[in-house]
Amino acid sequence: VLGGLGVAAVAGGGWALASVVGPERPVTMTPESSAHPAALDRSALRRRTAIGDARHVYEVDGRATPYYVQDAFAATLAAWMTTHRTLTGQRPDALHSYGGWTQGAGTSWHHSGQALDIARLRTGGADVASLRYDRWRDDTAAEVRRRLRTYWQVAAGLHLHFADVLTYLFDASHSNHIHVDSGRFGPGGVPRLIPRSGAQVQAIQAMCVHVWGRTGVQTSGELDGPTRDATTAILRDHGGTGELTDGVEAWQAFLRATIRQARDA
């Protein structure tokens, strides 16, 4: 599981920043998994009340509520929260979600305790990041720009730790939360860009537009010329090298630069 912004070797040469703090350690290029969700009973999962230092709150009723996920998935959530706190300077004391495990037949990673639907991050009773696109998408243009910048900052951090990150761009059912799961690379896998992943490509396109101001990029889900040109230029200008498709190192460098750009805007 990734924990901090240390440096790790990648199979095939080069180095990848695989964590937020911690020693250098080798990692391999995690292969994609062909696994499917396995339905688990809630009794097989541990009861949890927080993600890192942030208590878990059920978004529907605003009450502190336990959630249930597998141990490895919980560790990745905690690592992401460390990344978020370190790179943004925010100190969320509450994370609102629609829950982790849900009972089902194994058609969703929620059924195996390897997914969470994140709605808001809050500090002292106030939002520091709202992923409730459904609530603010019709606000003033200036307010929507501000919220989109923060939204995609959070999404960038999630993409550092999870390969499957579904936003309002995926479909309307995700307009009130960001969904994360560990299905593509399995628990503890190191995410990287999969060029055929429409969700990943749309995310980097939205980051280009809403964080970097690259308005010539379209959120098409296709890794087209304008997207490649914009992301390569961002990498070049902010300490990275190569292209996003080069592997873990470039992927992480782009995402970390995006988080910092949103923070400093």
Sequence positions of predicted segments:
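N-terminal export leaders
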Residues: V1-L5
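Active-site acidic/histidine clusters and adjacent loop/turn architecture
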Residues: G22-H96
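Long, well-ordered alpha-helical scaffolding segments within enzyme catalytic domains
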Residues: G62-R91, T123-T167, S197
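Surface-exposed patches in mature extracellular/periplasmic domains of secreted proteins
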Residues: T88-W101, S130, A163-A172, V217-S220
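Envelope-exposed proteins and targeting segments
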Residues: R91, S112-D117, N176-I178
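Short, surface-exposed glycine/acidic/tryptophan-bearing loops
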Residues: G104-R122
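Extracytoplasmic and endomembrane cell-envelope/extracellular-matrix remodeling and assembly machinery
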Residues: F170-S173, H179-G198
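Short acidic, glycine/serine/threonine-rich helix-capping segments at coil-helix boundaries
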Residues: R192-D264
